[in-house]
Every structure is written in C-alpha cells, then in structure tokens.
C-alpha cells in the first residue's frame, strides 16, 4: 500500500529519488496507468470530475459578474458605451506611486482599475442586463450552480450513485440526450431569453423577476403560433434609425430574417439571432429523436457504420469495427471532441469580428483584437491535443484484428502516401511563399519596389463577389444587380446583407490584395507543416521501418540507444512536442495578419498594410517594431503611463519564453552534473546543511525537460503577444 505521494502508484511511491515527485505529477491524470484502476471506475472518475470542471467555470464566471458589479462601472458604461472604458476590477497594489494611481484611475472612477478587454460588458448589455443588481443576481445564481455541481460530483463518487459501465457506453441514448437536451433545449432556452428579456430591453423595456410574467414579448401573444400565422412574428421589425436600448423607432417583431447589422450598434439584429437559435433548437430536438433506444424505432449506430462499405468492394470494409473501437477508446472520443472544439473556437474567433453579435463591440478595437487572438490560440492548443490523443489511441487502444481492412487499418497501410503528400504540399508552399517574399525584400532593399512580384487573389475576390461584394467588378451572382439571386435577396431573404457586405464600417468581407495573398499562403504553409508533423506522429505511433515495435515503448520514450540506428525524437510525444512549435508559429502568423490589417483599417490607413505586407522587412519594421514602441515606452526615466503594466508583462513574458531554451537546448547530463555540484555545496554549507531531504535529487528525463522547455516557450510566447496586441491597440485607440 502506497503511503507517500503518489498514492496511485506503488512503484513510484517507493522510488528513493526525486523522480517520485516529478513522475507522480506527470502521471496524476493518466488514470489508465494507476494501480487497481478498472475500466468502470476509470469512467466513473472522469464523469465525476466533469462536475468539478463545471463548478470551476461557474465560480470563475460568477467572479467576473461580482467584481464588475462591485468595482466596475457597468451602469455608467451603459449610458455611453462608445466613450466610457469598461472596468474589469479595482487594483490594490502597494507598489503604486502617485503617478500610477493617477494613470490607472480610468473609466470615470477615482481609484486604479483594470480595463475589461473581454467583451463581457457588451454581452451583458446585449442580453438585457441594465443594473449592477442584475450582475449581483447573476453572480449569486452561478455560485449556487457551482455548489450544486460540486455536490453532484461528490454524489456520483458514492457507490449508490456511480453509473455503470453500460450506461457510459449507451451511445444512442447519450447522443439523443445530448442532441435534444444539451444543444436543442439549451438553444430553445436561449431563444426564449432573447425574446422575453433581451429584445424588450433593446427597445427600452427592462425585464426583471418583478415584471417577467406580466410583460408579453409580442402584442399578439401565442395566437400566431397556434393559428399557424408564424410570419406575424416577423412583421414590423426595428427601424434602421432605432436607438438601441430605447423605444425610439423600435418595432414589434421578435423573429426576423433581416441580415446585416443594426446601423447604430453595428451588431447583428437581436431578432435575427433569436430566429437563428429557434431554428437550431428545432433541428437538434428532431435530431435527438433519431437513434434507437426504448421503442425499437430509429437508427442503430452500429448498423449505420457496418453498412458504410465502398460499393465496389475494392476499398476495404469501410466503417466495420469502428463502433466497438470508438466505444471502447476514451482517447479516440477525446480526440474527436478536441478536434470539434478546436474548429468551433477558431470559428468563434472568425465570427466575433466579422459578424459581431454584441452591441457596440465592433467599436471596441482592443476587445476585438484580444478576443480574436484568444480564441485562435485556444483553437491551436485544442487541435494539437486532438492529434496527441489520436496518437495515444493508436498506441494503447487500437486493435489490428478488430479493425482488419477498415478505414483505420487502410489509413495505416498507406501512411507513406499520406505523409509524403503532406510533405510535398508543405515544401511547395514553403519554397514558393518564401521565394516570393524574399524576392520582394531584395528588390525593395535595392530601391526597385516596382519590381516586386504582386499577385492579386482573383479566386478569393471572385468568391467574395459571388457573396455580393461589388468592389472588384466581377458581375456574378450577388455582385450582379440583374441576377435572380440578387432579386431574391431583396424580397425573400436577408434584405440588409448586400448593404452590409459593401459597407466599410464593418469587417464582414475585407478588401484583399497581394499582401493578403502572400500571408494566406504563409498561414497555409504553417497549417500543412503542423498537420504533417502531427499526422506523421500518429500514423507512426505504433511502429515504423526504423522501429517496428515502437508501440511497446508507449506514447513517450526518450531514446532507444544507438543500436537501433538512433531512435531519439521518434516517439508520438516528440511529434506533439514539435507540432506545438509549428502550431504557435502558424497562430502567430494568423494573429499578426489579422491585427495589422485591422489596426490600419481602424486608423483609416489601409494602404500601410497593402504596401508593406508584401515583403518580410515590412512585417518586421512596420508591424512588429513600429507597434512595439508604446510598450517599450510604457515606463522610462521620465515616468510611466497606463500601458506600463503591459510593458512590464511584455518584458517578463520574453524572459519566460527565453528560459524555455535553457531546458530545450541542454539535456539530462548537464543537469545531473549541476545537481550533483549543488548537492555537494549544500551539504558543506553551514546552516543550509541543517536542511536535508529523503529523496535523492536526480535530473529530469529528456522528455520531462523538453516538456518544461515547451511550457516555458509556449506560455512566454503567448503572453508576449498578448501584451503586445493589447498595448499596441490600446495605445492607439484608448
């Protein structure tokens, strides 16, 4: 019985070295590897932990609401959302001198504060909150939810309330409940909130618990619903001159299909958003009745998968065997979930700026930049995690006999073709894109900028034109005033779409040129190289010509000695490790592009991006160097300003990032010798040698040292850019 940490591993707890601590931390969440873990209690532990996770999320969001209500300026911001800076919370810092107290007292308050760049003010305002009391009530409600989740998590660890393994593997029932309940009913509930609370608030009618049941959201009530005259709910929408939050020029419609943006707030029409959620709810509630459970009707997922066979018979057994493979592999399921969530996060980044749903958020430029960057980085980490768990699936859970000749088996069989094609695409994109950039740098450097190779993205421009952008002169589909699609747009669907897409006050379809063409292909290079590394890591996780028995060594192993021809760097974990660097590279280029293009548009100086983005020195000089000046001057010999905290973070994050290289470049032997010298010195130093330890200090393994380096590199990289993007944008527009 293990008595020391880690209690989940007898062998580790009896290890006499510091390896016990570090390996204990590293494997604390690898439940499968713990002593005495059965499949059933593995599922039960993970299930119970979900409630803890939800409790943390509710506690965190409750904290946001509480601090804004207590120390923020929500009601003052509502009165003038374009001029007043939203306050996240107060700062109590003994380091602040008089200059700092003055510099950080902003947003109309007389004490130092942090400004909110998360967009929560815009969200709360849009969904109908109007007073600090509303925020306090929300904070209290979420605290109660957090407590309930903690209780539920504890409850489901008790023997009486632990679900059985068959419950976890009842795929049809789970899908039905998640589709109908999680997606369908929650979307319907949100639609209800928008109709009953948010839309009336946008028209000057504040809805609280005191008048919720006595204020009908539509004058006709439910009569149009029951009589089939549903179109009545779309009649009399808000006028384009409607002033948000007041009854001035407001309408009565609750479900519309207007398209475009509210002219004052430059955000989507709330009545369009409500209609969207109602449609989603209907689709998902129907979808949640598709799979066969109680009454023997509906689809059986196993039958569907078994029926998915290529008709010619020459391409294997299709999806045969996948039902059991996926049902019995948590890593496969987690990989799929992470991939879906990664795509959703990236889509969120894209949609929050191109079709902003929250009132006035498109005018808060720092928040727009922060939210885009935040969601793209989250997407990157989630996607890399998806591939990591895909590789773990191949090492731990994949059964060649069970998957004989199906799609998984055939994918592994022709992995060389997949890997070599990805390699070819990456090489093509890399050489051509870099070649164009470098050519342009050379001719600009030698005083011949007119000799740059500038390629217009005509295919992308044509796609924009088909959606209605008229700038490029393509007379096609919605860009043609005489096409049937354009005629339908005016009467049948989204009448405001064409106005919005050709309006320069939004980021719906930005004008693109040669600079966009080049950086698009640079990002494509990053995406394909990251994919190459991660796909190769997963497909080679079980074995390769160099090391056919790789799966027996596990997901991560450092090296297998020179006898194998050198097997360092070929574990599936090493692919994840290398993939993270390329992912950060790719997200870096993506966020640089988005940020530079937007700050030039917001400043009314789009030509700066257009002219400087076609060669590398333009990026280094006119984006990175030029925009870092407000951070470099955040504090200096002459004093400080309200960007000084970002200047300090910029410096500190660089330090964290640089520390990563110390672990990435020097490996185990160096650290072992250093530790031995430090132990020797410690044991011979008076007073210090009164402190002893039971565990013999040993250096980290190569894999662990790489992980420490990777974490420093990643955290430092992201925080450096966070400080840069916030300070450079706030310095211009705050």
Curated annotation (Swiss-Prot):
Residues the entry annotates as binding chlorophyll a B1: 654
Cross-referenced PROSITE patterns: PHOTOSYSTEM_I_PSAAB
Catalytic function, reaction form: reduced [plastocyanin] + hnu + oxidized [2Fe-2S]-[ferredoxin] = oxidized [plastocyanin] + reduced [2Fe-2S]-[ferredoxin]
Pfam families, per database record: PsaA_PsaB
A GO term, aspect molecular function: chlorophyll binding
Signal sequence bounds: none
Enzyme class: oxidoreductase
GO biological process: photosynthesis
Spans traversing the lipid bilayer: 46-69, 135-158, 175-199, 273-291, 330-353, 369-395, 417-439, 517-535, 575-596, 643-665, 707-727
Binding site for chlorophyll a B3: 662, 670
Chain positions recorded as phylloquinone binding sites: 671
Co-factor remark: P700 is a chlorophyll a/chlorophyll a' dimer, A0 is one or more chlorophyll a, A1 is one or both phylloquinones and FX is a shared 4Fe-4S iron-sulfur center.
NCBIfam families, per the entry: psaB
Subunit structure: The PsaA/B heterodimer binds the P700 chlorophyll special pair and subsequent electron acceptors. PSI consists of a core antenna complex that captures photons, and an electron transfer chain that converts photonic excitation into a charge separation. The eukaryotic PSI reaction center is composed of at least 11 subunits.
Protein name: Photosystem I P700 chlorophyll a apoprotein A2
Organism this protein belongs to: Cyanidium caldarium (Red alga)
Protein encoded by which gene: psaB
